[in-house]
From Swiss-Prot:
GO terms for molecular function: D-tyrosyl-tRNA(Tyr) deacylase activity; Gly-tRNA(Ala) deacylase activity; Ser(Gly)-tRNA(Ala) hydrolase activity; tRNA binding. Belongs to the DTD family. Signal peptide: none annotated. GO terms for biological process: D-amino acid catabolic process. It comes from the Bacteria. It comes from Salmonella typhi. Keywords: Cytoplasm, Hydrolase, RNA-binding, tRNA-binding. One of its GO terms (cellular component) is cytoplasm. Pfam families: Tyr_Deacylase. InterPro entries: Daa-tRNA_deacyls_DTD (IPR003732), DTD-like_sf (IPR023509). A Gly-cisPro motif from one monomer fits into the active site of the other monomer to allow specific chiral rejection of L-amino acids. The gene is dtd. This is D-aminoacyl-tRNA deacylase.
Length: 145
């Protein structure tokens, strides 16, 4: 399971001219689900994402996680993160989980975030989405479990 996380001052996702999720300061999480992923991996990745200390403390040091910084989380499914780009000029998506399994794990991940009392907004699974963000820093990390 892969999360591309970006520290943002704001972010939103729109589907068919409807804003489905919008946050102020916090994390934009682009989430990719791979074939071998399960609930245990989703739990570990959620723990890492929410615990990752990439927000500044009073001394300006990256020392706070999203909850300590009072931030929110916007989770957007992105199957392209599981692509194999090793060869050729066209990505292969054979490493991605089947859509039904990917959706179940995506929803599980979102629910785990919400259980941590963090404002968690979402896109719409498998939809064509427009994502807007203001990357703060920029600060972007690739987390994989």
């Amino acid at each position: 399971m892969i999360a591309l996380i970006q520290r943002v001052t704001r972010a939103s996702v729109t589907v068919e001219d409807e804003v489905t999720g919008k946050i102020g300061p916090g994390l934009l999480v682009l989430l990719g689900v791979e074939k071998e992923d399960d609930e245990q991996k989703a739990n570990r990745l959620c723990e890492r994402v929410l615990g990752y200390r990439i927000f500044s403390d009073v001394d300006g040091k990256m020392n706070l996680n999203v909850q300590q910084a009072g931030g929110s989380v916007l989770v957007v499914s992105q199957f392209t993160l599981a692509a194999d780009t090793e060869r050729g000029m066209r990505p292969s998506f054979s490493g991605g989980a089947a859509p039904d399994r990917a959706q179940a794990l995506y929803e599980y991940f979102v629910e785990r975030c919400r259980q941590q009392a963090i404002n968690t907004q979402t896109g719409r699974f498998a939809a064509d989405m427009q994502v807007e963000l203001v990357n703060d820093g920029p600060v972007t990390f690739w987390l994989q479990v």
